[in-house]
């Protein structure tokens, strides 16, 4: 009898171990123990979450789906590691393709225009929220999660834990995208140089105030001049006070649309985006969904004094204070240049590259010490002379999962499962430690990040601070991101080449944006292409009329006020006390 029990037990164990559910659970346990640590969940909670994925994925087992994102370390981890984990646990194979940001936007635009299902899901910048909420070609996730997609929506998804949910919410209050990664554009500087007594003394003697984190652009300019002109060499190395790029290429467009005009102070007050004028200089009155213009003559600010000032300073600093050749660099060439260790500060630096800037010294990174601790820090972006309290202070990227109605429902459901897997609490904390692009408030406040904070140059302190809300992506004023974005690099690239002055370039840009929006208006009025929320351009009025109205667009001000700085350590204490 005991022998029979033993035989039957062995048969039962064999049957269970060969069943899909048992295999999935075993694989889930392996991934939980070996890869998905640390987590904000206990291991038993992680197992319960993975059990849900196994059951919800059963109807799609054996399916092969395709998703697309841009190429940053976070998405490389998803493409190489998380696809493998997901397939072993659920039986769904995912081809996660990585392309440049411009190519991702092009693929999104092609799927929207043709209705052909190129990919089953995209990690698409939330900069397109105004596009998706108007065209209604993307799936409204609020209704999806409560309706057709409810059977494949993770009960523990916890939308309120996502720091960027406001970025992916349309004017109708519906969620159109699910944040997958976030990174801000902040100020970067050599903390070790700024702490040197000899340099601090020399700076104060020349400029009359303390060397520190610049609060305004006047101070940034003074510091750039100080290191490039007055210091010149540190430890036998020629150093520079500024770093940027200027090549006439698509990435020059997002160099500007990623809130450069708002940093100068060109928009209106309002968070996450200015109302009525946003960071692109596009005006849309409060409580409406119809943009009315980008030109000052229509109440916009794309060619207002603040915008022209912003472009002039970008061009001027690049030529005066950046390393030789920087004006001909594109975005991708400028990044490795910073790790050479010969730049004192950078006003426009994406935190997505924290992981590469904390690489060990032996890998060629000259911005860490022998123990691997950063010699640099990140801090809030300085603001221009047109900026007012209550305005956004910079840009934050929120690459977000986006589903399209043109994707067959079964494939859409399978892709939605993978999307949720990549941001689930089982996975997200480990993914955040790999890519350093936090999406969950619970993750950035975890003890593991408290421990790691000293080696991350201020990233943890920033994301735990109340200041983080002042950095946001492109908002809902932009009615069609792909159509309008391409105008920027083409027009501003002509400033770098010397073909046009900043004023001429911004006049041309504003005029062309209004022209493109007038075509959108015609299409929307004729066939509700933008759901009735397309542009409705204002009639033109004189520049003086609009520049004399309250708020943005703003008349010219003193563009070189007194420089103002703050000590970095004092800044961190201020964050901690809030």
Predicted regions and their residues:
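Short, polar/charged alpha-helical segment
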Residues: 49-56, 73-91, 188, 192-194, ...
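Hinge/lid segment of periplasmic solute-binding proteins
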Residues: 25-59, 126-186, 281, 375-381, ...
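Periplasmic solute-binding protein
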Residues: 126-137, 142-146, 162-209, 221, ...
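Long, aromatic- and glycine/proline-rich binding clefts that accommodate carbohydrate-like moieties
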Residues: 50-52, 64, 373-383, 395, ...
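Extracytoplasmic "Venus flytrap"/periplasmic binding protein-like
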Residues: 84-162, 196-198, 202-204, 344-345, ...
């Amino acid at each position: 009898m005991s022998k029979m029990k033993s035989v039957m037990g062995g048969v039962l164990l064999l049957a269970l171990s060969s069943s899909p559910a048992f295999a999935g659970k075993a694989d889930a346990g392996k991934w939980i123990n070996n890869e998905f640590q640390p987590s904000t969940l206990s291991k038993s909670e992680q197992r319960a979450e993975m059990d849900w994925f196994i059951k919800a994925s059963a109807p799609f087992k054996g399916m092969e789906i395709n998703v697309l994102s841009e190429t940053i370390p976070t998405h490389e981890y998803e493409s190489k590691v998380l696809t493998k984990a997901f397939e072993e646990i659920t039986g769904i194979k995912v081809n996660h393709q990585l392309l440049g940001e411009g190519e991702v936007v092009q693929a999104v635009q092609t799927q929207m225009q043709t209705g052909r299902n190129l990919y089953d899901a995209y990690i698409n910048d939330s900069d397109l929220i105004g596009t998706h909420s108007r065209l209604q070609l993307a799936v409204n996730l609020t209704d999806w999660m409560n309706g057709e997609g409810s059977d494949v929506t993770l009960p523990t998804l916890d939308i309120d834990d996502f720091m960027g949910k406001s970025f992916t919410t349309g004017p109708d209050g519906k969620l159109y995208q699910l944040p997958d990664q976030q990174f801000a554009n902040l100020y970067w500087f050599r903390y070790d140089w700024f702490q040197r007594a000899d340099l601090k003394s020399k700076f104060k003697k020349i400029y009359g105030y303390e060397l520190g984190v610049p609060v305004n652009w006047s101070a940034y300019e003074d510091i750039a001049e100080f290191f490039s002109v007055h210091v010149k060499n540190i430890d036998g190395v020629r150093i520079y006070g500024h770093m940027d790029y200027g090549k006439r290429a698509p990435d020059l467009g997002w160099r500007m649309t990623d809130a450069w005009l708002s940093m100068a102070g060109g928009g209106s007050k309002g968070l996450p985006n200015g109302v009525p004028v946003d960071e692109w200089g596009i005006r849309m009155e409060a409580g409406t969904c119809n943009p009315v213009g980008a030109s000052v003559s229509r109440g916009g600010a794309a060619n207002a004094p603040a915008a022209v000032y912003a472009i002039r300073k970008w061009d001027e600093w690049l030529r005066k204070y950046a390393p030789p050749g920087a004006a001909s660099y594109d975005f991708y060439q400028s990044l490795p240049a910073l790790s050479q260790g010969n730049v004192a500060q950078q006003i426009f630096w994406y935190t997505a590259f924290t992981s590469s800037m904390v690489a060990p010294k032996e890998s060629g990174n000259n911005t860490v010490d022998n123990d691997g601790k950063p010699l640099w820090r990140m801090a809030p972006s300085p603001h221009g002379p047109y900026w007012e309290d209550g305005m956004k202070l910079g840009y934050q990227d929120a690459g977000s999962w986006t589903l399209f109605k043109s994707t067959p429902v079964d494939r859409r459901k399978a892709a939605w499962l993978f999307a949720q897997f990549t941001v689930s609490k089982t996975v997200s904390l480990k993914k955040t430690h790999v890519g350093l692009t936090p999406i969950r408030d619970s993750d950035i406040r975890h003890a593991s990040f408290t421990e790691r904070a000293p080696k991350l140059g201020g990233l943890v302190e920033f994301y735990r601070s109340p200041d983080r809300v002042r950095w946001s992506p492109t908002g809902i004023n932009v009615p069609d991101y792909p159509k309008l974005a391409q105008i920027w690099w083409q027009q501003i690239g002509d400033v770098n080449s010397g073909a046009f002055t900043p004023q001429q370039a911004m006049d041309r840009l504003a005029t062309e944006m209004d022209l493109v929006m007038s075509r959108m208006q015609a299409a929307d009025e004729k066939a509700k292409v933008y759901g009735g929320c397309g542009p409705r351009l204002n009639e033109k009025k004189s520049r003086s009329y609009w520049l004399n109205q309250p708020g943005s667009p703003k008349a010219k001000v003193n563009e070189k006020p007194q420089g103002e700085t703050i000590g970095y350590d004092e800044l961190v204490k201020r964050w901690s006390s809030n």
